[in-house]
A protein has these predicted regions:
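Glycine/serine-rich loop-strand microenvironments at binding/catalytic pocket rims
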Residues: 39-73, 137-140, 165, 208-233
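Short hydrophobic/aromatic-rich motifs at helix boundaries and adjacent loops
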Residues: 19-23, 52-56, 101-105, 116-117, ...
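Amphipathic, charge-rich alpha-helical segments that serve as recognition/docking helices
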Residues: 82-85, 89-167
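Short, charged/polar connector segments at secondary-structure boundaries
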Residues: 1-99
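Hydrophobic residues in alpha-helical segments
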Residues: 14, 52, 88, 136, ...
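Short secondary-structure transition/capping segments
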Residues: 1-8, 12-15, 102-115, 142-154, ...
Length: 273
């Protein structure tokens, strides 16, 4: 994991309001390709859609109009827009109140959304981590205090995101599955991280044979086989190793961990209770 290195806090790109409040129809709006939310689960969308059908859009969305274009691009409010599109397709007349801002840079728009969602419904952890990665690379910042000031994320949240970003993209994508039933929860990577480190440090033969990615895939397979009932059960492995008082006890835990990794049907609690 990347360490906390001191860094000068960069100047914060900002979103500049234009002072305009408009009412727009769904077809006047374009969704931003840079929206870091990624996940739009059906159940909360249905709840929001029902509320909009009954009361209209109560909270204005935030949009900007690129120079020379007629349509407005959504900076904040894609969920409301999606619901209004569906309602319009069902025959309802829907308009969205919209605060118009000056066209922002990509990074300014992203930081704006970070701040908005810190005070409202937070993003899922994986989209947050991927958005944070853009911020860190674009602004060349890795210091947690600087990131906190820019995004409003707490330092523990930032550390969790940095752990997620150590996993290859192919694993990150598993937490962006549009189907919540088959999606690997973002916390899976947080809880698996120390277990994988333990494997690399103490089960060197196993780690050399399969590689870190191979070990990760085995844990994913075990989760999909429902042999990891809760991702926090990974903590039992680390607790068992930490409380082992003798080398013989540690070896017994490591032998069980090796068996656990290789046997997809061995459930976590059964192995480490």
């Amino acid at each position: 994991m990347a360490s906390k290195t001191s860094a000068q806090i960069p100047d914060e790109p900002t979103v500049v309001p234009s002072g305009l409040l408009k009412e727009l129809t769904p077809d006047q709006l374009v969704r931003s390709r840079d929206n870091p939310r990624h996940l739009f689960d059906r159940e909360p969308l249905d709840e929001l859609k029902k509320n909009i059908r009954e009361h209209g859009v109560l909270v204005p969305i935030t949009v900007f109009q690129p120079k020379g274009q007629r349509k407005y691009y959504i900076l904040d409010g894609e969920r409301r827009h999606r619901c209004c599109e569906e309602l319009q397709a069902e025959g309802h007349t829907v308009r969205l109140p919209a605060n118009v801002v000056e066209p922002p840079t990509k990074i300014a728009g992203l930081l704006y959304m970070f701040v908005i969602h810190n005070f409202r419904e937070p993003w899922e952890l994986m989209p947050t981590a991927l958005a944070l990665d853009v911020v860190m690379k674009d602004l060349s910042v890795n210091d947690n205090k600087a990131i906190n000031r820019l995004t409003g994320l707490s330092e523990p949240q930032i550390e969790r995101c940095k752990i997620i970003l150590t996993f290859p993209e192919k694993f990150q994508k598993l937490s962006l599955d549009v189907d919540s039933k088959t999606r690997i929860p973002s916390n899976f990577w947080i809880e698996a991280y120390p277990v994988l480190n333990l494997c690399e440090d103490e089960l060197t033969g196993l780690a050399k044979k399969y590689g870190r990615d191979g070990l990760t895939e085995k844990l994913v397979d075990k989760y999909r086989a429902r042999k990891i009932r809760s991702v926090i059960h990974f903590r039992r492995i680390m607790e068992a190793y930490k409380v082992a008082e003798t080398k013989e006890d540690q070896k017994a835990v490591l032998d069980k961990l090796s068996e656990y990794i290789l046997d997809v049907d061995l459930e976590t609690r059964k192995a480490f209770d």
